[in-house]
């Protein structure tokens, strides 16, 4: 959400060169945007603009590649996420996000940063050895 709304911490997130997301972001980000609309924090036009920007980042278009590298939600990833629920007491979607990050790091150890603002997910990612972005919230 920090990529699309000027919330605390947005500058740090927007400065990231590479953004890897779980395929769940396809639902989570628009959900967060529309939740802000229902709460009166955004009007419909702003929400449509933000969702469109997210869609472009997620899918790309004929003139640009997607901004995100997307991790598919597979059976083995869900098994790993279930372990993260047991290990850290995470909510289901947060466990999938952490399992996705762990899978990427296993393939490329240079992927050692984890951007997150949810305190429970941040704590779990830190315990899993990720460098947290931003360093403080």
PLM-predicted stretches and their roles:
Residues 25, 77, 97, 120-121:
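Alpha-helix capping/helix-boundary segments
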Residues 55-88, 95-100:
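Acidic catalytic patch
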Residues 1-26, 31-50, 136:
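Short, well-structured N-terminal submotif of metal-dependent ribonuclease cores
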Residues 15-19, 84-89:
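A short glycine/serine-rich beta->alpha loop
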Residues 21, 72, 92-95, 116:
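Short beta-strand scaffold positions
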Residues 39-41, 60-65, 103-110:
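Alpha-helix termini
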Residues 7, 23, 75, 118-119:
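Alpha-helix N-cap/helix-start capping motif
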Residues 22, 103-137:
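Acidic, PIN/NYN-like endoribonuclease modules and their adjacent C-terminal/linker elements
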């Amino acid at each position: 959400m920090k990529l699309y709304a000027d919330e605390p911490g947005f500058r740090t997130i927007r400065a990231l060169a590479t953004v890897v997301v779980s395929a769940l972001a396809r639902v989570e980000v628009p959900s967060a945007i529309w939740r802000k609309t229902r709460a009166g924090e955004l009007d419909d036009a702003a929400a449509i603009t933000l969702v469109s920007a997210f869609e472009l980042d997620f899918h790309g278009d004929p003139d640009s590649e997607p901004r995100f590298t997307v991790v598919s939600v597979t059976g083995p990833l869900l098994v790993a996420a279930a372990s993260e629920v047991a290990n850290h007491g995470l909510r289901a979607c947060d466990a999938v996000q952490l399992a996705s990050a762990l899978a990427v790091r296993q393939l490329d150890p240079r992927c050692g940063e984890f951007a997150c603002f949810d305190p429970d997910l941040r704590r779990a990612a830190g315990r899993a050895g990720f460098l947290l972005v931003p360093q403080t919230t």
